[in-house]
Amino acid sequence: MKNLIAELLVKLAEKEEESKELVAQVEALEIVVTALLRHLDPNTQQTLIASVEGALEGVQPESNVPQRDTELLQQYVKKLLRHPRT
């Protein structure tokens, strides 16, 4: 029983480490995208935003992807493009 608990704790620690790495990757990408958007002139920025939003509208998720996941992705992309980090 102790071995099982120890294995579960090790797996939990590994998952937590993976989660931290993913959070760091997402934050790094958010910083890069924000910096890139800020260096574009307003017309180019709006063209890029419209292009990304248009591409998302034209894509249908696979049936096994929960609707909530799709909505979260769309909301986050919109937030990132329209209201980047300050």
From Swiss-Prot:
Main location: cytoplasm
Transmembrane region(s): none
GO biological process annotation, one example: cellular response to starvation
Top-rank lineage group of the source organism: Bacteria
One Pfam family here: Anti-adapt_IraP
Keywords assigned by UniProt, alphabetized: Coiled coil, Cytoplasm, Stress response
Ranges in a coiled coil: 1-36
Compartments where located: Cytoplasm
GO cellular component: cytoplasm
Record text on subunit structure and interactions: Interacts with RssB.
Family: Belongs to the IraP family.
Described purpose of this protein according to its UniProt entry: Inhibits RpoS proteolysis by regulating RssB activity, thereby increasing the stability of the sigma stress factor RpoS especially during phosphate starvation, but also in stationary phase and during nitrogen starvation. Its effect on RpoS stability is due to its interaction with RssB, which probably blocks the interaction of RssB with RpoS, and the consequent delivery of the RssB-RpoS complex to the ClpXP protein degradation pathway.
Protein's UniProt name: Anti-adapter protein IraP
Organism: Cronobacter sakazakii (strain ATCC BAA-894)
Gene: iraP
